[in-house]
């Protein structure tokens, strides 16, 4: 039987924003969710009601995180790294700055995000569905997917995690929307715009075991 990976917060040094959950809950509608789930301009660079309200590069986000990733997963210039749900490629851009010879790849469902990715690394990115990654088995030393898998329904969550497992020959790490109690569940429901699958942390762990995901994981809890 496959073993569960580590519950580890490798994003501990990622800047945490203070969020007005009540305001977001009041302004959110099914229409806003539908627009956000298209993952186009409106989600990345349109109104805050539909997503980020401007998804722009800043070195303060990923550069503090990269040393933790390098330390935990022995990522080096000879590594092959995949970001599933790479958006505009900001993580991979900063990783390439730190390790210029590293082999990077990124996939995202959003044509808009890939078309508007960092120009320096756009050639390494492609539009693809997380449930069918366009790579051979064991293609990568490290696969990461941040706040992406939960945007799929439960069946497709399983497929995407199995795909991460398939293309990774060493390590992987994901984060998903989760909660530990009723208060956190209520906050999650207030905050959620795009996720189709949200579970308690123990339910996620059982799910990982059930579908055979052995990589590391952590939670997004607003």
PLM region spans:
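A conserved beta-strand element that flanks and buttresses the S-adenosyl-L-methionine
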Residues: 144
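Hydrophobic adenine-recognition pocket in adenosine-nucleotide-binding enzymes
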Residues: 148
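Class I (Rossmann-like) S-adenosyl-L-methionine-dependent methyltransferase catalytic domain
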Residues: 1-73, 78-134, 152-159, 163, ...
């Amino acid at each position: 039987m496959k073993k569960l990976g580590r519950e580890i917060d490798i994003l501990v040094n990622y800047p945490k924003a203070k969020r007005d959950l009540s305001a977001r809950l009041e302004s959110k509608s099914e229409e806003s969710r539908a627009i956000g789930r298209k993952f186009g301009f409106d989600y990345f660079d349109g109104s805050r009601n539909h997503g980020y309200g401007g998804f722009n590069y800043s070195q303060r986000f990923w550069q503090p995180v990269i040393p933790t990733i390098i330390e935990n997963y022995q990522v080096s210039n000879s590594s092959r790294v995949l970001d599933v749900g790479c958006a505009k490629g900001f993580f991979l851009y900063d990783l390439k700055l730190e390790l210029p010879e590293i082999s990077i790849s990124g996939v995202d469902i959003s044509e808009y995000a890939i078309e508007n990715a960092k120009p320096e690394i756009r050639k390494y990115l492609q539009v693809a569905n997380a449930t069918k990654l366009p790579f051979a088995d064991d293609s990568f030393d490290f696969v990461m997917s941040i706040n992406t898998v939960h945007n799929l329904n439960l069946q497709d969550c399983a497929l995407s995690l199995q795909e991460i497992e398939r293309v990774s020959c060493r390590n992987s790490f994901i984060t998903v929307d989760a909660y530990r109690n009723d208060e956190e569940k209520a906050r999650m429901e207030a905050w959620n715009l795009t996720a189709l699958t949200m579970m308690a942390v123990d339910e996620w762990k059982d799910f990982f075991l059930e579908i055979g995901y052995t990589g590391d994981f952590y939670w997004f809890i607003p």
